[in-house]
Amino acid sequence: MSSARGPRRPTIVDVAQRAGVSKSLVSLVMHDSPRVAPGSRDAVLRAARELGYRPNAVARSLVRQRSGVLGCILSDLHNPYFADVADGIEEAASQGGYRALLSAGFLDPAREGAAVETLLELQVDGLIMLGSMLELDAIAEWAGQIPVVVIGHASASDVMDSVTDDDEAGATAAVDHLVALGHRRIAHIHGGAVVSARARRRGYERSMAAHGLAANVRSVPGAYTEDGGASAMRVILETTDIPTAVFVANDLAALGALDALDHAGVQVPAELSLVGYDDIVTAQSPRVALTTVA
């Protein structure tokens, strides 16, 4: 049985022969050496384009001891908030002379860990973890190998940096707002095991207690997804004591909750007030008009 093979990839030797120069000169050009005359550089680059030659990124990283690539793990590609942050990461990386290589964790700690290992095998120069489902102790092991920044985790670790807002305070502000509107029966759709979701749940409970509403605390299991928000809202609507307001752990889940309310014929905010979190672009649409914590 014969097996078909793709066309042979051009090598640095092929480029040297096409340009009529030495292999070492081609190597200097590919490593952006300032010791190459402009005419020779142009000839090498032209030959490389004609042949479709691309330098081996792994080999270059071994020589330079850096890849020029930052690995970025997003826990959920479907979350617009994460997409907005990833866009900013890509722009900042580009300005710093780096490329960002994105990978997804799919809200699954095991898959997220596997994605990190793959990025480490690709010799990325640093790792940015957005909305990680992993505990900080696990992340700290990788931080001992390369620089790591976690977004959404508050870390006091000496081996990694963290970027986060005060999720607990934001959730407290959301409940304070609803109480100021006159609501007393305020439920919460929480976001599951994500670190930020746990902090937002604490903020909800703290604010309810501060307003003397601890007996009214009602936290319904959900997730940082539209399906998670919709299913949790359906659970709420099936009860006999329906709250007058619901604080949802993030905007994506709040959109799902809005959809469930719409299907049930419940008008927002006339019959039930809803507050989300993250201030994603969709929440700003006039057709949605979702109150959210920025």
Where are the regions a protein language model picked out?
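Bacterial carbohydrate/catabolite-sensing allosteric modules
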Residues: 1-6, 50, 91-96, 144-150, ...
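Short gly/ser/thr-rich secondary-structure transition/capping motifs
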Residues: 50-56, 109-110, 129-132, 258
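Alpha-helical recognition/docking segments in bacterial nutrient-uptake
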Residues: 1-10, 65-176, 180, 238
